[in-house]
């Protein structure tokens, strides 16, 4: 194959654009979606999730996160060029057309729908509000003062879907975990929004960081605290083994470190603090994994 041929160069360019639109080169969003989904799968299956179900949720999560990123860039195409962090995205650079992005979104959603085939009808039904939330979230930044809460709903729907897929029902512990994850998402995405706060104020985009104003850090920590409290409530409801409870002091320490970091409100530090939430995700997964092991 001639690597310098016009066709190859064209295909290589489009592949690069699609990878960047999907954020396939930045897995943090997929991880933050996967952790709560895995928490739910392990709890619902008593630590032994069916491999087909696990694969369906893992692949489906990646595809829907990718679709969400593409439609987000489509929605923000007139603003990204004015924001320091997003000025090099494909739309901001004029490298992608609107129709192209919409077709890519539809294709990714279709692939994600195929992941539902081995799952039950209740899971299919619950995928509809999940799809609606994922595709409409980017547009809430025009009118909703706390779009990060809406994102929290979208990022949490994998939890009841996981319980539905495993047990064909959505018990109370699923909704406790759902509420906890909404608060966690609101916390870390507000930190993410703090990194863009100055730019968002200039262009008129609504975010929780803008809405909370000088109380943004207090709001973040209240959400973190509520998240941890609900995880403790969840532990009490499920009769968690001792290993589950070891996560709480570790997570509290990680949350305190985040507080110490974001007090500076420095753009890069806020972004790095957002990334650090991956640690909280895997700590809770390890705790739930250990709980299901020792509870047997």
Curated annotation (Swiss-Prot):
One Pfam family it belongs to: UbiA
GO molecular function: 4-hydroxybenzoate polyprenyltransferase activity
Any single GO BP term: ubiquinone biosynthetic process
Topology in the lipid bilayer: Multi-pass membrane protein
Cell compartment(s), UniProt: Cell inner membrane
Required cofactor names: Mg(2+)
Listed pathway(s): Cofactor biosynthesis; ubiquinone biosynthesis
Gene Ontology, cellular component aspect: plasma membrane
Annotated catalysed reactions: all-trans-octaprenyl diphosphate + 4-hydroxybenzoate = 4-hydroxy-3-(all-trans-octaprenyl)benzoate + diphosphate
Keywords on record: Cell inner membrane, Cell membrane, Magnesium, Membrane, Transferase, Transmembrane, Transmembrane helix, Ubiquinone biosynthesis
Family that this chain belongs to: Belongs to the UbiA prenyltransferase family.
Function summary: Catalyzes the prenylation of para-hydroxybenzoate (PHB) with an all-trans polyprenyl group. Mediates the second step in the final reaction sequence of ubiquinone-8 (UQ-8) biosynthesis, which is the condensation of the polyisoprenoid side chain with PHB, generating the first membrane-bound Q intermediate 3-octaprenyl-4-hydroxybenzoate.
NCBIfam families per the UniProt record, alphabetical: ubiA_proteo
PANTHER family named among the record's database cross-references: 4-HYDROXYBENZOATE POLYPRENYLTRANSFERASE, MITOCHONDRIAL, PRENYLTRANSFERASES
This protein's name: 4-hydroxybenzoate octaprenyltransferase
Native organism: Neisseria gonorrhoeae (strain NCCP11945)
Encoding gene (name): ubiA
């Amino acid at each position: 194959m001639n690597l310098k041929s016009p066709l190859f160069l064209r295909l290589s360019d489009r592949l690069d654009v699609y990878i960047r639109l999907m954020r396939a080169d930045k897995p943090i969003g997929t991880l933050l979606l996967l952790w709560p989904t895995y928490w739910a799968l392990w709890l619902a299956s008593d630590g032994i999730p069916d491999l087909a179900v696990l694969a369906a949720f893992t692949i489906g999560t990646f595809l829907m996160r990718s679709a969400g990123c593409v439609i987000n860039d489509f929605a923000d195409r007139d603003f990204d060029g004015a924001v320091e962090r997003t000025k090099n995205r494909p739309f901001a650079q004029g490298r992608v057309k609107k129709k192209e992005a919409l077709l890519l979104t539809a294709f990714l959603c279709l692939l994600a729908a195929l992941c539902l085939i081995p799952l039950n009808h209740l899971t299919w039904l619950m995928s509809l509000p999940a799809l609606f939330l994922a595709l409409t979230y980017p547009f809430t930044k025009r009118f909703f003062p706390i779009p990060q809460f809406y994102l929290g709903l979208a990022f949490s729907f994998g939890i009841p879907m996981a319980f539905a897929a495993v047990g064909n029902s959505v018990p109370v512990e699923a909704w406790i975990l759902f509420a906890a994850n909404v608060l966690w998402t609101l916390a870390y995405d507000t930190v993410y929004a703090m990194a863009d706060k100055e730019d968002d104020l200039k262009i008129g985009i609504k975010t929780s960081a803008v809405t909370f104003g000088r109380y943004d850090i207090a709001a973040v920590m209240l959400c973190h605290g509520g998240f941890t409290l609900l995880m403790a409530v969840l532990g009490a409801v499920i009769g968690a083994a001792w290993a589950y409870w070891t996560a709480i002091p570790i997570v509290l320490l990680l949350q305190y470190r985040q507080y110490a970091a974001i007090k500076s409100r420095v753009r890069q530090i806020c972004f790095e603090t957002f990334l650090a939430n991956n640690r909280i995700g895997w700590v809770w997964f390890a705790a739930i994994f250990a709980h299901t092991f020792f509870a047997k």
